[in-house]
């Protein structure tokens, strides 16, 4: 029985129970406009956008790091991708989003290692910089993705792209040292360093991988919404939190060996909750309350004090 409670099957059982629990609550409260098969498929399609970002955040969150420039990079990379798509079509769109996102991730990792200040401070500063750059690049004009370039706006394009991202993460965690070393650094950075792990190198890799996935998320985001507007004043901050909640599901369920599945299903659970409140006619501010409350609960359940921890 003890081994079953640490198995992936037990983890899946908990996740599916949570899905059924929240679905049943909202289906009971508002049966007429919630939870049809079409609705569920729509919830899933919106949730996989955040799941991709959640997969990227996993690489740094397990090391105890945070990145508040994710939302700003989504906006900036989306704008760059849309502008390049006007001249180079799908190639410019995909490479613009993913390439721009990855380069920004490398820059963030380099600055974090060089400045030696907490990741929150570095990324908040870069968030402000990226927001301003996005306004400059966009020229103050809303960027619209051409209709002929919207393959990733819905099924099957969005599912294929997100699926490739999930497979890529599975490959990294299963067949490379990156996942193991990131976990080791998060458990005890000093011990990991004494074991010969190049801590700075893998933190840089973590940020690069995060923003590679952010680039993919940018493709899905601007395809789904078809437009992107550059805003300043920390307006992109709200884009950070929903993928982060999926990441915390992954961190909480990694003990069952199911981090990727937990991120995907966790984001689906969040989508059910959000859309359930919409079906009830609750004001949009309720979503912010739910987001904040969910973050507090998940962080409380997953955060643990570690001996030998350092300022992140």
Label each PLM-derived region with a short phrase:
Residues 21-29, 36-86, 246-257, 293:
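Single transmembrane alpha-helix segments in multi-pass membrane proteins
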Residues 32-42, 210-245:
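Inter-helical junctions in multi-pass inner-membrane proteins, predominant
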Residues 88-127, 265-266:
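Alpha-helical transmembrane segments within multi-pass membrane transporters and channels
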Residues 46, 119-120, 152-162, 203, ...:
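Loop-to-transmembrane alpha-helix initiation sites
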Residues 1-24, 167-169, 187-201, 277-312:
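Cytosolic-side transmembrane-helix boundaries in multi-pass membrane proteins
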Residues 229-289:
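Transmembrane alpha-helical segments in multi-pass inner-membrane proteins
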Residues 115, 119-176, 204-205, 225-233:
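Transmembrane helix-bundle core of multi-pass membrane transporters
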Residues 12-15, 25-26, 152-185, 198, ...:
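Alpha-helical transmembrane segments of multi-pass integral membrane proteins
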């Amino acid at each position: 029985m003890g081994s079953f409670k640490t198995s992936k099957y037990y983890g899946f059982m908990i996740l599916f129970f949570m899905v059924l629990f929240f679905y049943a609550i909202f289906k009971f409260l508002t049966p007429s406009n919630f939870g049809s098969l079409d609705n569920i498929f729509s919830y899933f399609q919106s949730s996989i956008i955040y799941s991709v970002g959640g997969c990227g955040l996993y690489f740094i969150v397990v090391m105890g790091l945070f990145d508040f420039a994710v939302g700003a990079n989504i906006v900036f990379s989306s704008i760059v991708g849309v502008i390049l798509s006007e001249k180079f079509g799908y190639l410019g769109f995909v490479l613009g989003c993913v390439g721009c996102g990855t380069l920004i991730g490398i820059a963030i990792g380099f600055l974090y290692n060089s400045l030696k200040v907490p990741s929150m401070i570095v990324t908040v500063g870069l968030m402000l910089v990226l927001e301003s750059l996005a306004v400059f690049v966009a020229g103050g004009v809303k960027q619209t993705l051409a209709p002929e370039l919207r393959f990733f706006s819905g099924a099957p394009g969005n599912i294929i792209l997100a699926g490739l991202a999930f497979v890529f993460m599975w490959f990294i965690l299963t067949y490379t040292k990156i996942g193991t070393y990131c976990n080791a650094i998060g458990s005890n950075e000093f011990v990991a360093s004494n074991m010969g792990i190049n801590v700075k190198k893998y933190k840089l890799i973590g940020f690069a991988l995060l923003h590679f996935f952010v680039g993919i998320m940018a493709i899905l985001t601007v395809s789904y919404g078809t437009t992107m507007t550059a805003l300043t004043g920390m307006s992109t901050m709200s884009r950070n939190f929903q993928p982060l909640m999926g990441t915390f599901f992954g961190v909480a369920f990694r003990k069952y060996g199911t981090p990727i599945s937990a991120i995907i299903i966790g984001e689906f659970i969040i989508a059910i909750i959000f859309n359930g409140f919409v079906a009830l006619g609750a004001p949009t501010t309720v979503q912010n309350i739910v987001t904040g409350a969910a973050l507090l609960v998940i962080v409380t359940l997953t955060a643990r004090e570690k001996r030998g921890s350092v300022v992140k």
